[in-house]
Amino acid sequence: MSEEIAKLTTVQNYRLVDLIGDFAGEELFLIDGDSLIFHILAKDSQFLAKNGVQILYAIYLLEKELARFKSARLNFCIVFFKNWEALYSQYDGILHASLLLFRRVAIRHLRKHVPVYVFKSLGDSQWSIFIAKHRPYGFMVLDSNQNTKEGGLVISDEQVMVFKSFIFFALSDGVPVALLGSYQFVDNKILVCILPSFFTRSSESVENASNLISDYLKKFGKPRQSIELPDIAVDACPSNASRIQTLSAAWLLLNEKSDLNVDLCKILIILTCMLEELSLNDRFQPAFPLYEDPAIQKFIISYLNATNTILQLLDSKVDGFHDIFDGRLFIRLVVDAALGEFCIPDICRESALSLWKLILDIAPDAGDLFDFPSLSSISKDLCVPIETPVSEIDISLTAYNDPVISPYYDTEEWNLEQREEPGIETVLDFSKLRINDKTMTSKRFDDLSATRKTGDNTKDRKQANKVRRQDQFFISHIQKYASSLTGAKGGQLKRQTIFTQGPNSTKESKQAVKEETSVKNSPKGKNTKNGKAEKEKPGKKSKAPKLSKAEQIRAEIAARKVEKEENKNEVIWNETKNDLGRIKDLNLRAGRLAQLLNTRTYDPYIENEMRLYRIRVLLSLWTACCVTDEGKEKNIKIAVEIFREISIVYPNPITKQVKAALDETLTALGFENVIRKMKKLESKPLSFPFVLPDLEDEEFDLEVPYTSPTFQLLHFGEYMERSMGSAPDSRVAFDPDEWQRETLDILDRDESVFVVAPTSSGKTFISFYAMEKVLRDNDDGVVIYVAPTKALVNQLSAEVYARFNKHYPHAGQTVWSVYTRDYRINNPTNCQVLITVPHVLQSMLLQPALANAWCPKIRRIIFDEIHCIGQMEDGLVEEQLLLLAPCPIVALSATVGNPQEFQVWLSALQRAHSYPIHLIVHEHRYSDLRKFVYGGAKEFNGLQEEGDLGQIAFIHPAAAMSFSDGSTTNLAFEPRDCLQLYYAMKLVSKGDFKISRKLDPDRYFEDIPFIKKVDAVGYEKKIKATIDTWASLPNAFAPNSPFQALIKHFCSEPQKVVNSQLELHNSAYSLDAISQNLLPMLKDLHSKELLPAICFNYDRQECEYLAEIVFKTLVEKEREWRENSEEWKEKMREYKKWQSTANQRAKQMEKFEKSATEKQKEQALKEAGDISWIEFFDPEEPSPEFSFAGAKSTYGKEELYRDLEALRRRQAVPEWYVDALYRGIGIHHSGLNRRYRQIVEVLFRCGQLTVVIATRTLSLGINMPCRTVVFLGDSLQLNALNFHQAAGRAGRRGFDLLGHVGFLGVPLHKIYRLLTTKLWDIQGQFPLTTSLVLQLSQLISGSQAGPFARDTIHALMDEPKFMANGSILSNQVNHHLRFVIEYLRREGLLDVYGNPINLASLTMHLYYTEPSNYAFMNLLKAGVFHKIAEKFATEKFEAMRDTVVILCHLFGRIRMNEQYVMTLEGSTDLAQSTVVLPPLPTEIADVLDAHDQRVLDLYKTYAWYYQKHGNIGVAANKLPLSNTTIEGSAKLPSSLSVGVMSEFCGLAGYNESMVGTTSSFLDKVPDGIFLKTSRLPIFEANKAPYNAYLLDFFTHGSVDMLIEQNNLKQSEIWFVLNDFSLVLATICSCLGNLLNLVTDEDIENAMSALEGSNAVQATTESEATGADWMQNMNGNYSTTLASPELEEKMDMNLFKVYCMFLEVRNQFDAKFRKMWA
């Protein structure tokens, strides 16, 4: 069992995820307290043993770790198990005693500040109740003992197995586990490796794990510290809990009355008082050899054990033990007493004497407190202090005179001591390198390939033609993509030509604008200002304006047109009635009418008549259903349709005759209470008789079996009128809601806006209105749309193309441009709407060449899906963009948990540019979402089967309340949910669990004839308030309470589905079970008209696997059906017969065409109608019974064939992917070919595809409206954020009035948690990276400190709150910036005036790899690669392998689990793979270590300056989490200085000279000093084992081996390899620029200078960076220089390095291309 547990809980690679942003959100996480203690002490435990017993310092470290969790907003609690004390019994002496005391003090102390729970064991019933009530989202447990640092606590394998067994316990119980061994804290994010829970909960496995833990704890034995205290000692306990030492000393005196014991007890009493009165800064004492004396050690152990026992006896509420003992100060006092130099502050002396009196009452012969006769015999050698190393901090700074940044720093204050200009030790000859060329340093990597010139005009023309063809093809593709897009109401987008309205517009533009304005001034748009109706002033009559002759003529013509249109509508309606009368099938007649009403706009009177006519038809259908009550219930949808038509017509202006007909219908339905009186109705006879159908049997009636309110809530919720203050507005082509009009007003004022509104609520129009406004203002302004994904970029480019057209006076200017890393269409600096991604926009804003010319033109930046700022990878860049934005912004999101807080931060940013930002929050979706769970399906045999194959159980939101402590805050209720909840509460209510009669629907809605959505929302709030009251009652969670009965009632149906699934499969959640249920579920959705559907699975391979299963099952079932179906066989016989007579028919038709009359031809066409299906029949096409292809697809058949076969010829995807498209099934994830993905999007919108299986790529704003969303299987990525994003695709506005969200293979507890989890807060990162500072310096330098550069720096430096929702103040940022500049100066990347120099360009172009870019720069400077290049000619592969090993340590690192690495030792299964990356050679690691040491020295200076300027802002004597102050002001002359370290670290004897690494130093600086490890360019080489996947791929090129041996996921391989390929391309490109290799001819000349017999392959730079992976050129050269002129001109040693890198890239990319080709 233990071996199985070890295997299941030991991961190979630590794949880190953002614990909060990507997983837990605000859900409760349970932290094992003992795991946390061991994790902290594994770094350093000397302060609990050899370095003195420092309980306060241990508490400080514990609080500091927990404070990090708090700052990251982790919702956590800590649990301890009493029997786990046995874990500490493996240790001896002082360490054992201090560990146990620390554990007990920690529990007691933390309980006051964070939730801490203590249970007897895992078998404790209270533990089970706790888990059942709180349902933690995950556990955090220690998993490894390999992170122990030198001096840290040694953790045995047996102890680790206890923790691993606990991990197994949690996983078996369905709870994921975060592994503490992988934990990192980056900025304010917790990065950790998470083990997903097992698919099926196993009570047997849970019990086995619990028993195994008990067995291990028994092996460890019981704690060896328990003692018995005399009653007198307990009685003598002082009321002041902080003086517990008094009681301990009394026990020690009574237990063993030796002279030494008596004197040490006196010291203990004095120590007690000194801990209360002494300042924390004066407690840094040197260490003494006396501490190791056995007698002293024995006394301390006895004291610690006594104290631990006494703490057990005290009330748990008594606090104040965090500073219970100071071992170093205790020894100091003993030494002073032994030397006769005992001197303590007077205040301590007085309080000590009062305590000593209590002792004398117990032990009268104890003597004088300040007399220590036995201590005088202590050897003087033991009293000599151990020397504490002290080092001076270099406080000098280099000169810095940047014209923009320097003014922010006071010269006298900062230049305390001038540092000499830094000298750079390097093998590079900078005099021969192109380092000061502004055009070169200002180039971003995205544009580097464009700087290469071939020197051949023919090649230039060919390349230009190729680019032109690509652009034309892209435009053609955009046109097709755009034609599939639809607007908010489901109609195709209409392209409008924009005319400039500004002062510089042309005469033609002004005339066009005037005409356009007159068109807009229709009755709908008149008398409005900013969307609000203008009121006429009272007492004044508006005069009709005097019209000119021409205007009178135009008015008459318009009136005649209106009259003609009205007459035309009447004619059409009369013809339509005649056509409808010929349709015998009433269902078809009603459907035809609905179609007519949806396709065009009619005169209001005629529309009323059409709807009344449809009511008459529906009443006939309803009559046929009313012969039984079952018939009414079964066909209630007909009554819903009748009521829907009435609800549309009734509020409109109607005639007496129409109202009479409606009232008669309402009376027949039993809804008399809906009828309302109306005055002054016009009279106009109906054009048809309206008579209610007669019932054959008088026993029956047409009444609906519900009251009107009940009927509307239960069945009419999706049809309720749902506008939220809608009103006409001339600015847009629809009636915007109130919040939308408010947004338009803000945009018109050129102010910023942050909009948070659910998916499908109508956010999209904001972006397009902002674009249109900029387009209309002038021809120069630019609006930028920033999309988080390239898929969204593609869609937006098509949508902008479909919406806007504009003619420009100058050639080359375009409306829009797309610019991503992959491609660019149109000129991004010569367009008005730029659509891009964060990295590219950041690149453009920081380009000096654009700073003065293009950046000032930016009028607005639109950030869609702004919540992505919280993501670990791209969020940092997006946060930097918000800081850099020089204009008003639009920020849009549907999923922000803290909009008010985030808006405050955005306001601060925009305030620097004088742009106010407004928050718009809209809480309600346009369409409700109905959730269901599916399972227990039978075998699929075709879509024609009747009945359901599986079970669908709809999930009532109340079922999820057990996972939210009964809160309904985050639950959304449909109207029918509210109704069901009311009656269920009424059923179980009793005692305190009451429900008001006012909530009875018939009473609540009695005065509301037609319930609107806003009315239902009000009712929802009140019903939720009642259930929240129930949940807050003391006995709400008791097993038999009404509240629990209510939850069980709603949980029963979904549980039945899960149970039925378990009866058919061993697991309801396995991939096999999902694959067997998926096709039956799709069939059932098809029969219920709930397609199209998007099925989300968060694993790419599983998406493809499930799609393949569906497709192949359809094909196989179709084959079986065709073989056995007589219907199909008969159809084939007819088809073959028809084919055999094709020639004969053709001849007859030709003869008939020549001789027949027109009448004969018409008759022939009618007779041929019955067999026309044969003409379109193709036996090769999928049968409709086995295809999900939409019957109403707008994609032409020939066009579909052409496009899909073109896709097949490109071999972009496997053939079955294309065949599946024919059957209406698609796949969508970011790893697929872009052309395939886009055709999937187009076909889905056009209705050809009705099933798409996708990852989260489709959840971020992609316009693919669907009726149903289904989640296939559980995943760590299926969190609240992704759930809300994906579920929002269902029921999109303009398409469906109700969306459906299904779950297949997702555990019920996970479903309920998703429904109740609050969207978490946006957590930003600290965006001022070292590379960004370097880029800003380049911006200032390259733009000659232009206005844009100055404004950018001003916004950064003057911003009071710098990090999203953080607390970084401006002075902290200024300090950080100055020392980043100091680092860049010392590393030779900036000169004294802030200009980038030397290797700055290379470092900047690798900015996305920070801090690895600085490590690479240092290795290049130090000649590491030069040395390897020396053997490149003779030992080519070895040289390349050495290079790749170094690069693998720098880029794309995946940390491995040390325990797993140990299992690989001696393995014979890894012959072709290295798996574990070899450590860097010592001489290379030394280069990186020397760099880290320079950084450490620099930031010691930083800490000194920070403290000197008094900007810490946090009291040095406060604990970081509890804010507990260590009181005291008394001084002690013998204390040492802690320097820049935290005063708490001084307790353990640390100062700045005693820390060896930067990360260790950062852990020990005062809490108020702003220093972030993640933002310092430290590397820490050979820190941990890393996966050698890049080296292995370079060696064997096998993807399968990467999966099998390196344990990489197939879905991530392409991306990590592509990232490394990009790094190689960047390095090669930058080295080529440094060498001034501008043209291919330059490279060839350089290579020809290297001649010899040793052949070495190389690749020209233009080819290496080509987008189409051109054929590589081979060149032969040796290391012998042949041209002295070239040697003088070029750094030939660096050129050898360049050639080596080109070859490394060549060989890596060759394998990489083979992998993805």
Swiss-Prot record:
Entry GO MF terms: ATP binding; ATP hydrolysis activity; nucleic acid binding; RNA helicase activity
Top-rank taxon, per record: Eukaryota
Broad enzyme group: hydrolase
Pfam families, per the entry: DEAD, Helicase_C, PIN-like_DDX60
Compartments (UniProt record): Cytoplasm
A cellular component annotation (GO) from this entry: cytosol
PROSITE patterns the record matches: HELICASE_ATP_BIND_1, HELICASE_CTER
Annotated Gene3D superfamilies: P-loop containing nucleotide triphosphate hydrolases
Entry keyword set: ATP-binding, Cytoplasm, Helicase, Hydrolase, Nucleotide-binding
Protein residues bound to ATP: A757, P758, T759, S760, S761, G762, K763, T764
Chain intervals with Polar residues compositional bias: 494-506
Motif (DEAH box): 864-867
Domain annotation Helicase ATP-binding: ranges: 744-914
Family of the protein in this entry: Belongs to the helicase family. SKI2 subfamily.
Protein's name according to its UniProt entry: Uncharacterized helicase C694.02
Organism expressing this protein natively: Schizosaccharomyces pombe (strain 972 / ATCC 24843)
